[in-house]
């Protein structure tokens, strides 16, 4: 077999660490010609069963025999053989057919009958948690910001708000690109639609706090444009955007963004909740909005885990571990940047442990084994977890307004209707 052919196969498969999609075969400079059915079959097997590639071995040795590769010629002109394209399209359709929630056969325009009860219940829970930015009073926060916080306090809060202000927009970009139009079941469409609306509220809340607290124009603009101006936040945003634009499967993207909302967000939530441990009870508006948003995000991660459980073809544990390791490395860099100084009861070492604890919890919810096996280092977060997972708002003045969402049979007519 010629070295040119080996180079071609390594170019295709050597650049992919875990899975191979047929689109990646199109995105190379070399072209396949005279492709045998056996060759296409081998490609399909590689795609349908994600393979962890040993970088020390030639990819061609792992997947193809020399005899099979000898059936491949390299040409420099378009188009590919239509026969190859047919095999690729047929394979993609076969994968979708194996996932009912992605199949057009599952599409319906009416809400009822409900077929996926857990997804529907999640949607209803999201509705019960509905809140608006106008409910949050920031008057005391402004005084606390100016008079009761240290420079270190303000520094880490600004980092967290800067990340969150951009992150909710990134999450919505993923919902538009990879979720709401890809999943064909009505229950998920409802749940993703409500999530999209609440992510907008989150972004509005964080942006409002930045403009309210930070009066220096240059600093405020830097924070608002953090995905361009702050390296540790840019790295997080780049990782998210990599998955938005990736040609990996729905399962990959579902796992990746469950990590974004379940791991990237958790450390920042914990750092804000730490303020609640302060004796002076500073920044009440920031804290209560953080509670509202943490509740929402808990439901969003729950939705991702429910959707993942509905897939017939889930990722290998080693693949999920690799994705979560990448995310934790990026998150630890953000933590070190946000918390360069040790605060009372809060530092980068403890936060790193907390991130791994949260990652383990997410792995279990996705159906995998724990990887890090560490304890929750923050006692105060155990109490917060109870609040976040509860089905009521203890501090909302209008909590009663959503009390009848579950009571679908209760209909009241006005006397003069």
Curated annotation (Swiss-Prot):
Belongs to the ribonucleoside diphosphate reductase small chain family. The gene is RNR2. InterPro entries: Ferritin-like_SF (IPR009078), RNR-like (IPR012348), RNR_small (IPR033909), RNR_small_AS (IPR030475), RNR_small_fam (IPR000358). Binds 2 iron ions per subunit. Fe cation 1 binds at residues 168, 199, 202. Ribonucleoside-diphosphate reductase holoenzyme provides the precursors necessary for viral DNA synthesis. Allows virus growth in non-dividing cells. Catalyzes the biosynthesis of deoxyribonucleotides from the corresponding ribonucleotides. One of its GO terms (biological process) is deoxyribonucleotide biosynthetic process. It is an enzyme of class 1 (oxidoreductase). This is Ribonucleoside-diphosphate reductase small chain. Its cofactor is Fe cation.
